[in-house]
Design a protein with these regions (language model features):
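Extracellular/lumenal glycan-associated context and N-glycosylation machinery
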Residues: 1-57
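An amphipathic, basic-hydrophobic helix/alpha-beta surface used to engage anionic
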Residues: 38-282, 318-322, 335-336
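Acidic, glycine-rich A-domain
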Residues: 255-393
Length: 393
């Protein structure tokens, strides 16, 4: 409708100037008519210009995106003709929270391809969908504006940030002295629970020959690791300002566990959660990372209910619970569900802006310690020293 209004305005202007020249006569009136004709013709051409033939694509920063990283976006706009155009306004709406539309104005002239760039600092974790680009052509004097959109749906996934740290099993004082060696021996007699991609170092006896016969691709049997029942990494999903930092620390611990000489289990609670009885290779880490990229925090009451109903917790002797907020009810529920617990550790992750426990949380520390839980408070700057703090206790 706006396009039609612009066309009607142009026709009205052209008729007015022509009528003025016809009835007024003289050099001035006819000069005015001929002087405005090129601009009017250019505006009419803009109106009828086949904008649908233009194509647009986005390209993003290469490689895996992590929280806090900078994203560079490059927009390529192409057309098939050489018709001269004045300038075009390109608007893109990034899907990230609190991001305003990114607009650029570019002079086109005879160019058939235009490249525009913009950047987004400090990406938030999650999966996001870029939608349509909005383009706007304008004539020389701004009499006519032609807007349209080009559908360019693209998804980007921002993963949690991994910090390298040295993992120390909290259950090293019971049955973990030669965990890796016994894990290898256990595999020889354990029952396979699935198959995975072949990893360097896998034994010939672990190869899944039936799968190899069908696909001609080496795959390895995935075994249930009963030794891993000793230690569990559990992420508390209670909503908090430092929830994303807690997610970052969780994937860092899982990565360190997979790279160490010990094994452990992982539970991400909730209806869309996952349970890994053993974290033994990078494939497990990648699966956890994909899930943590899109995990959302829960209200406190729902998180308490998940803990109180999770019977899997009762099979573990050592538990590393990572939370962004220490709460008495959840500590009580966790204690009740872990009758075999010998070593319990709460990592309470805080932001750099507020690195200390609140008054309410300080009161819970004594309650947790009385029930066998150690409590370590961590801002992101101390992630690398997390398990050093555990050894000091």
């Amino acid at each position: 409708m706006k396009h039609h209004a612009g066309l009607i305005g142009l026709l009205g202007l052209a008729l007015t100037i022509f009528a003025y020249a016809m009835f007024q006569g003289g050099f001035v009136s006819w000069f005015l008519l001929y002087a405005t004709l090129p601009f009017l013709m250019f505006a009419f051409i803009i109106y009828f210009y086949p904008v649908r033939k233009m194509t647009a694509t986005r390209t993003f920063t290469e490689g895996e995106l992590t929280r806090g990283q900078k994203l560079d976006v490059e927009i390529h706009i192409k057309r098939s003709d050489w018709w001269p155009l004045y300038y075009m306004k390109v608007t893109d709406q990034p899907p990230f929270p609190e991001e305003t539309p990114k607009s650029r104005v570019v002079f086109i002239g005879f160019r058939r391809e235009v490249v525009l760039n913009y950047s987004i600092d400090k990406l938030p974790r999650g999966a996001y969908e870029f939608n349509a680009l909005e383009l706007e052509l304008v004539d020389l004097l701004g009499w006519l504006r032609k807007r349209w959109t080009i559908s360019t749906p693209q998804q980007v996934v921002v993963y949690p940030r991994i910090t390298e740290l040295s993992y120390t099993p909290i259950a090293s004082n019971y049955d973990q002295g030669a965990a890796r060696a016994r894990y290898q021996m256990h595999k020889e007699n354990a029952v396979a629970t699935g198959v995975r991609e072949y990893q360097p170092g896998d034994r010939v006896s672990w190869i899944h020959w039936k799968s190899f016969a069908k696909s001609q691709t080496l795959r390895t049997k995935d075994f249930e690791d009963r030794q891993a029942q000793d230690t569990l990494v559990y992420l508390d999903l209670t909503e908090s300002h430092s929830f994303d930092d807690a997610v970052d620390f969780t994937i860092s611990v899982v990565q360190a566990m997979a790279s160490s000489d010990t094994t452990g289990a992982f539970i991400l609670p909730g209806t869309r959660g996952i349970y890994l009885p053993a974290i033994t290779h990078q494939g497990h880490v990648e699966r956890v990372k994909r899930e943590l990229a899109t995990v959302e925090p829960l209200e406190e009451k729902w998180m308490k209910r998940l803990v109180a109903e999770d019977k899997r917790l009762g099979t573990f002797k050592g538990i590393i619970c990572i939370t962004a907020e220490l709460d008495k009810d959840r500590v009580e529920a966790m204690t009740h569900m872990t009758p075999q617990l010998r070593e319990g550790l709460y990592f309470v992750v805080k932001t750099e802006a507020s690195p200390k426990l609140t008054t309410a949380e300080l009161a819970v520390v004594d309650y947790a310690q009385a029930r066998g839980w150690s409590v370590v408070v961590l801002p992101p700057s101390q992630f690398t020293e997390a398990f050093l703090e555990v050894l000091k206790r």
